[in-house]
Regions:
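Single conserved hydrophobic/aromatic residue that forms the stacking wall/gate
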Residues: 1-15
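Compositionally biased regions
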Residues: 3-6, 26, 38, 44
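Sec-dependent N-terminal signal peptides of Gram-positive bacterial secreted proteins and lipoproteins
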Residues: 14-40
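OB-fold and OB-like single-stranded nucleic-acid-recognition modules
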Residues: 41-203
Length: 203
C-alpha cells in the first residue's frame, strides 16, 4: 500500500530527526576561506585551481568536524581526482566500492581504509550547508544519520542543488578519517568523515 509506505516513511524521518536533535548541537563550516594559498595544480575535473587532494588536505583542520587524512585516502584522492565529484556520466567501477564497509570498521581503525569508496543508502539529511571557497566553486557539507543511528560528515566538492534538510540521500564517498563534536548532552558524538563522490536525493 503506497499510502501506508509513505506514512511509515514519515514516521521514520521524524524518529531520525528526534534522535539527531537530541544528540546534536549546531555544527557549521568554520573558517573555510578562499583557497588562495593552494593554487598549485588546477583540477581538470572541476576547473577549479585546486585538486581534490588539495581541498581535503586543506579543510581537514579548517572545518567543524576536523579529521586527519589517512595515507590511503591521500593516495586515492591523488589518483582519482575525477571522482570528486563524479559526473553523472561517469560509471564508478564496482571494484572501487567496498560494499561491506560501514561506520563500525572505520571507527575501529581509520588508517586501514581510504583505498576504496563506501556507499551509504537511505541516509537522512540533518543539516546541509554550502560555502563558496573560490569564485564560482562551492563546498557542500552534509550532516547525515543512517538507519543504524550512525552519523557521517560529508564534504562534497561542488553544489547539490536538489538536496535539502530532511531529505533522504544515497551517498558514495571516500572515508577520510573520523571526527567528533560535543553534543547537547555534554558527551561526544563520533562521526565518519567522507569526501563526497556522488550524492543522490532518493525522496
Amino acid at each position: 500500500d503506497p499510502e501506508m509506505s509513505r506514512g511509515l516513511g514519515d514516521v521514520y524521518k521524524r524518529q531520525m530527526k528526534r534522535i539527531a536533535i537530541a544528540a546534536l548541537s549546531a555544527v557549521i563550516l568554520q573558517g573555510v576561506t578562499p583557497l588562495d594559498s593552494l593554487n598549485v595544480y588546477a583540477s581538470e575535473n572541476t576547473g577549479a585551481s585546486y585538486t581534490a587532494l588539495d581541498l581535503y588536505t586543506y579543510i581537514q583542520d579548517q572545518c567543524s568536524t576536523e579529521y586527519t587524512l589517512t595515507e590511503k585516502a591521500e593516495t586515492f584522492l591523488e589518483e582519482h581526482d575525477d571522482l570528486f565529484p563524479a559526473s553523472t556520466e561517469l560509471v564508478i567501477p564496482d571494484e572501487m566500492i567496498d560494499a561491506e564497509l560501514d561506520f563500525r570498521h572505520i571507527n575501529k581503525n581509520p588508517s586501514r581504509y581510504g583505498d576504496k569508496l563506501m556507499r551509504i543508502s537511505d541516509a537522512y539529511v540533518i543539516q546541509v550547508q554550502e560555502e563558496e571557497i573560490e569564485e564560482g566553486h562551492y563546498l557542500t557539507w552534509l550532516n547525515l544519520i543512517d538507519g543504524e543511528e550512525q552519523q557521517y560528515s560529508v564534504y562534497y566538492n561542488g553544489e547539490l542543488d536538489d538536496v535539502f534538510e530532511d531529505d533522504t540521500v544515497e551517498v558514495t564517498g571516500l572515508p577520510l578519517g573520523t571526527s567528533s563534536f560535543e553534543n547537547t548532552e555534554g558527551g561526544d558524538t563520533l562521526v565518519v568523515v567522507l569526501a563526497g563522490c556522488r550524492v543522490n536525493n532518493i525522496d
